Amino acid sequence: RQMCIRDRYGSANYQVIEDLAGNIFAGYTGVINTSFTGNNLYNVTGKDWYNAMFNDAYTRVISAWNQLDPQRGEFPEVVALADIVKVAAMHRVTDTYGPIPYLNISSGDINKAYDPQQAVYKRFFEELDAAITTLTAFYEAQPGTKLLEAYDNVFSGNVSGWIKFANTLRLRLAMRVVYADAALAQEQAAAAIGNPVGLMTGAADLAELHKPATGSWEYPLYMIQYNFDDSRIGATIEAYMNGYQDPRRGKYFVATAKGEYHGVRTGITPTSSYADSEDLSRVNCTNNDNIMWMTPAEAWFLRAEYELRWGSESDAATYYAEGIRTSFSTLGASGAEAYIADKELTPGSY
């Protein structure tokens, strides 16, 4: 069914790139579609699945970026935004596939060489540094000026929002290379933290693609769970959140008729009776929801990791707790302080 609707529904592309890949691997969701039995977490045999992220990135992101790149001299701030979006998209690709064509993608040569991930990441840092420098200078010179406000469905032209997102993205990438190149990781993390505009800190800084005022829109997870009817929440995240009696469960999941939260175990072969069960919870979402790119809670957790490695343990604990508080407040959930203070609860049964 899904292979027939990929071109019709953007959500189907999202499904094979995100929901049937990272979400399942992490235990956030689990498959209930019985026709997926030959194509699950342990046996991804369909090329339309494992090629999807690669193809989508180059045909949708890189092709658009290549049209903007020649305008860098005339519209440096606009291309800086494009550079940030490119890195945000492509770091997922290299983390999935390893070496990718990247260093010479604007050369016009159709036979691009595959660059080692180390070189790709260093280019990411160079591009983010240049984009952040360009936008910071623009913001400091014209603090109230919007950039592409009529077209920006992420930050509505708010330049400081893009800078905070780029700084936080830089910090994320820095912490990802810490085991490969600790010196580079520390250098890039410090640069992200030290930028005068700063990192994402609260709900106002959320990086998410908003539903446009006009035109068609669909929220992929809603389509996957309520229209395609292909997945439910994962047993892994459910076990942790049930065990910790996490007050955010109702924000993330829809309770069953019994008022409980139950998820799908990773890698199972679903049967018809299992797929039709009313005892499995769905993701709590609507078709009008925004598509999340990055949360401010992640920024606090990354800052905590930085402090744990190169700063003080007390600051690490402070930032980690602030990450939890920010997650709660962003979702509109209460009970963060009790959740942080608890030292007795453990993950539930899987």
List where the protein language model places each region.
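Short, small-residue-biased leader/transition segments that mark boundaries at the very start
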Residues: 3-5
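Acidic, Ser/Thr/Pro-rich intrinsically disordered transcriptional activation regions
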Residues: 9-24
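Structured, solvent-exposed acidic/aromatic patches
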Residues: 29-85, 89-335, 343, 347-349
